[in-house]
Amino acid sequence: MAAMLGDAIMLIKGFVKLTQAAVETHLQHLGLSGELLMAVRALQSTATEQVGMVFGQVQGQETPEEYYSESLDDPEGAFHFSGMRAESASADVSAASSPEQSPPPWAHAAGSEGPAPAYVASAPFREGGVLGQAASPLGRVNGRLFASPRDPFSAPGLQRRVYHQDQSSMGGLTAEDIEKARQAKARPESKPHKQALSEHARERKVPVTRIGRLANFGGLAVGLGFGALAEVAKKSLRPDDPSGKKAVLDSSPFLSEANAERIVRTLCKVRGAALKLGQMLSIQDDAFINPHLAKIFDRVRQSADFMPLKQMMKTLNNDLGPNWRDKLEYFEERPFAAASIGQVHLARLKGGREVAMKIQYPGVAQSINSDVNNLMTVLNMSNMLPEGLFPEHLIDVLRRELALECDYQREAACARRFRELLKDHPFFYVPEIVDELCSPHVLTTELVSGFPLDQAEGLSQEIRNEICYNILVLCLRELFEFQFMQTDPNWSNFFYDPELHKVALLDFGATREFDRSFTDLYIQIIRAAANQDREAVLKKSIEMKFLTGYEVKAMEDAHLDAILILGEAFASEEPFDFGTQSTTEKIHNLIPIMLKHRLVPPPEETYSLHRKMGGSFLICSKLKARFPCKAMFEEAYSNYCRRQAEQQ
């Protein structure tokens, strides 16, 4: 009899669920959802409970044996958020969670519109495992839970407490489950906007030895060779459209989309100096690299692979000592960002303050020279570098810059200096350094909220204008007032917080100083360009050793035209429209001439300076900013001349 009753229970419950599914499908087909679906589910849940009560009472008279009963309508839907439909999210949350709970991870998922993809509401922090899945604070929850037939909480309309077969509410929890619940309670309540690791990032050990890193570059070289052959064959069968616009690097068959994928995969794996070069490619405009390739290279900014837990812990123990966790209340073992030199983890200090811990990849500092040499071998073999770039000079500069970036103690000092310089600024702020958790390979700062500027396109025109205006003013102040500049224009180094309406400045590893001897001449070149004075630009360019004075006329004209084009933004009192300007296209047409006829490499300072200034203009272009620039430069120029006079 008991077996028959059990079968009847299962049959009736199955019929009720089938009816619910059919009704929901029909309602969704008719475009009805929300409260109506909630009502249907509530009726189904009540019906299930009534059936359980009736058969439970009969069962209690027949036998003490227990049968299945469900405490929730859909336990998987309540505890396994990643598979839920967006349109029913509000109904499911209201049914399965208390009102005090923070929004689930999908509330700001990458698929939503506007700037939301850049950050996530991360209150229920993810367990180590599949990104985007939220874990129950009680550990793993099965699709069915055992319940007592005489459960006093099983009355209709009341949510029943779940019991196991041993009549204990804790009987089925393992030590691991209890520990997870304890950690979940200790986790910090995160800020409303938090950076998330790219879905392309994978956990892979950083190749530390020189041979291990060389093997990756060797595999890349072979792959590029086969990819180039395939690209040549494809182009021979389908000639390019002669009317189409080409970027500077489009002429190389080695830089096809397939090869770009190969390069990005290798760079994200080896990280370090090689990935840094890839990040430089990721912030170029259409004139230098076509949009399809730029989109591929864009992944290297936030989708570098991250270290396995064991390798990461070894770095922390070696640098901070074995008891470094004693200073923390919580530490997130999965990073929320991974870049060229290191990866960033969320943590919380004992006092409750949330911090970001940047941990350097092992072997990166020691492998700079070999990485650069290996990468240059691949690039030279594939003929990717146009003539006239003076790669030897460029690589020497890159080596020195990377060596400085690998010194986290130097970066901490630069961040403190910038924080002091901008302490009273109404729009920018620099996160505070946490000295007790800093070392040559670990850098800890306070956690900032917001999203990077490449995700700010959905903001209003007024806010975008204000952001870009302040960035250009800061760029001029760094060069001509501080003479101390953060030269990495990666969009992820500028985080906009819509709640504070401020931009946080991050990553000061690429910070450098500029001598007065350089800035005295450079500001005169910019001034002459703003005034469209070709003779003054030529004179100062020779003084700065941009030119020797012996260049052919074509090279001289191309150089002067390029500088005058760059000065156009500072030449007019009318608002300059960065979104529709043709500056990059005009310069793009001059690059082949300059690469062909250049006699000397540009001054060393200009590599990092032009990277920063060009990146700042690209931010303005991407955000389609529109504002007058002449007054900002005139103010910078007059202030510079005043300080110059005071110091004489």
Curated annotation (Swiss-Prot):
Any one Gene Ontology cellular component term annotated for this protein: mitochondrion
Main location class: mitochondrion
Function: Atypical kinase involved in the biosynthesis of coenzyme Q, also named ubiquinone, an essential lipid-soluble electron transporter for aerobic cellular respiration. Its substrate specificity is still unclear: may act as a protein kinase that mediates phosphorylation of COQ3. According to other reports, acts as a small molecule kinase, possibly a lipid kinase that phosphorylates a prenyl lipid in the ubiquinone biosynthesis pathway, as suggested by its ability to bind coenzyme Q lipid intermediates. However, the small molecule kinase activity was not confirmed by another publication.
Biased composition (Low complexity): 90-100
Domain Protein kinase stretches: 329-518
UniProt transit peptide range: 1-162
Protein name as annotated: Atypical kinase COQ8A, mitochondrial
Pathway assigned to this chain's UniProt record: Cofactor biosynthesis; ubiquinone biosynthesis
Entry's localization field: Mitochondrion membrane
Family: Belongs to the protein kinase superfamily. ADCK protein kinase family.
SUPFAM superfamilies membership: Protein kinase-like (PK-like)
Subunit-structure text: Homodimer; homodimerizes via its transmembrane region. Interacts with the multi-subunit COQ enzyme complex, composed of at least COQ3, COQ4, COQ5, COQ6, COQ7 and COQ9.
Protein encoded by which gene: COQ8A
Keyword field contains Protease: no
Species name: Bos taurus
Transmembrane segments: 214-230
Active site residues according to the UniProt entry: D488 (proton acceptor)
Topological category with respect to the lipid bilayer: Single-pass membrane protein
Lineage start: Eukaryota, Metazoa, Chordata, Craniata, Vertebrata
UniProt remark on domains: Adopts an atypical protein kinase-like fold: while it adopts a core fold similar to that of well-characterized protein kinase-like domains, a number of features are positioned to inhibit the kinase activity: (1) an atypical AAAS motif in an alanine-rich (A-rich) loop that replaces the canonical glycine-rich (G-rich) nucleotide-binding loop and limits ATP binding by establishing an unusual selectivity for ADP and (2) an N-terminal domain, containing the KxGQ motif, that completely occludes the typical substrate binding pocket.
Keyword annotations of the record: ATP-binding, Kinase, Membrane, Mitochondrion, Nucleotide-binding, Transferase, Transit peptide, Transmembrane, Transmembrane helix, Ubiquinone biosynthesis
CDD domains per record: ABC1_ADCK3
Motif KxGQ motif per UniProt: ranges: 276-279
